[in-house]
């Protein structure tokens, strides 16, 4: 079974974990911001299909 030759230092481990958490926090912040803009109707990046009465009856 393959095993690492040396133990990873705590500082390197913590640095990697901090990077991962920072990226996750940034993505969460972007998702929350996007959700808020969609709810308030300020989102410009989405194209909503026009709802015609003919299409809704089908």
Curated annotation (Swiss-Prot):
Protein's name in the database: Large ribosomal subunit protein bL32
Protein's gene: rpmF
Cystine pairs: none
UniProt GO MF annotations: structural constituent of ribosome
One of the protein's GO biological processes: translation
Keyword Ribosomal protein attached: yes
Signal peptide limits: none
Region described as Disordered: spans on this chain: 1-24
Phylogenetic lineage: Bacteria, Bacillati, Cyanobacteriota, Cyanophyceae, Synechococcales
Cellular compartments per GO CC: large ribosomal subunit
Keywords: Ribonucleoprotein, Ribosomal protein
UniProt family annotation: Belongs to the bacterial ribosomal protein bL32 family.
């Amino acid at each position: 079974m393959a095993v690492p030759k040396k133990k990873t230092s705590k500082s390197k481990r913590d640095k990697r974990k901090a990077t991962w958490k920072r990226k996750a926090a940034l993505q969460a912040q972007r998702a929350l911001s996007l959700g808020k803009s969609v709810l308030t109707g300020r989102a410009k990046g989405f194209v909503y299909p026009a709802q015609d009465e003919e299409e809704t009856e089908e």
